[in-house]
Amino acid sequence: MNELNDLNPVDRICAGCQGEPGQRVFYLQARKGGQLITLLCEKFQMQQLAAGITKFVDELQARFDELPAAVTNFEDAEMELEEPLEPRFRAGQLGLGYDEAEDLLVLVAQELTENAQAAPGEEPPQLDQPIEQEPPDGQAARFWATRQQMLNLAAHISLVASRGRPRCGNCMQPIDPTGHFCPQRNGFKH
């Protein structure tokens, strides 16, 4: 079943997580009027998305020098997830596009399906690769937003991702609440 969830343009777009560090679940969420769409994502996807948005907006500014500058400007409370957190699907491939006529960025998320997963040894699709118009299998969502909304999303994702587990000063691995086995200390727990 192919289903496209299209919010053009969004009233708000945000990301967040729930759970304890090391066990967190990440969400991407957008709203247009009464329609709220929540997607389940992986932390690394969110981090790649934040970097991709920043790079993409920088490239747009360089390519279209007549565009007014977009700046990051948000309050943490504006970027909080809304209830209910009922994900439509788990995101597999994420991509970005730009509508020059409307000056809107589009974030496209395709559902992670068995057919969409990378084969062993194969690299997953990157943000800068072309996106198929229709999902090959499963659902897709398109969130159309201003450059400022997307930059705010990228900045907020960076904040959310950085709130994870503290890192060990010796091996730089995450430290769980119960400690961790550090190879630099011959595997002793600390």
Residue ranges and their predicted role:
Residues M1-F26, L67-Q133, D137-A140:
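Intrinsic, low-complexity N-terminal interaction/targeting segments
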Residues R24-A30, L49, I53, L105-A109, ...:
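Short, structured motif recognition centered on aromatic/hydrophobic residues
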Residues I37-E80, E86-R88:
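Short, well-structured hydrophobic secondary-structure segments
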Residues L40, G97, R142-W144:
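Generic structural detector for well-ordered beta-strands
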Residues E114-F181:
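Mixed-charge, glycine-accented linear interaction segment located at domain edges/termini
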Residues P183-H190:
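Short cysteine/histidine-rich metal-coordination sites, predominantly Zn2+-binding motifs
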